[in-house]
From Swiss-Prot:
Name used for this protein in its record: Adipokinetic prohormone type 3
Molecular function GO terms recorded: hormone activity
Modified residues (Tryptophan amide): W30
GO biological process: one example: neuropeptide signaling pathway
PROSITE patterns: AKH
Superkingdom of the source species: Eukaryota
Length: 77
């Protein structure tokens, strides 16, 4: 009885493995995104102006958080 249960479990596992598909290596070009995949070096190119505007926006938000924290601590004391 135990041998039969192990055999049935093995068959179920083999059928599950045979009917499923998996991709073991995940890259930026897997799945539906692969249709319009950029060339090898395209995904790392960014203009300096775009990077500077992102940096400036982040710095402005950090400054707002600092000011808000300072205002809150002054109001509580």
């Amino acid at each position: 009885m135990q041998v039969r249960a192990v055999l049935v479990l093995a068959v179920v596992a083999l059928v599950a493995v045979a009917t499923s598909r998996a991709q073991l290596n995940f890259t930026p070009w897997w799945g539906k995104r692969a249709l319009g995949a950029p060339a090898a070096g395209d995904c790392v190119s960014a203009s300096p102006q775009a990077l500077l505007s992102i940096l400036n926006a982040a710095q402005a938000e950090v400054q707002k958080l600092i000011d808000c924290s300072r205002f809150t601590s002054e109001a509580n004391s």
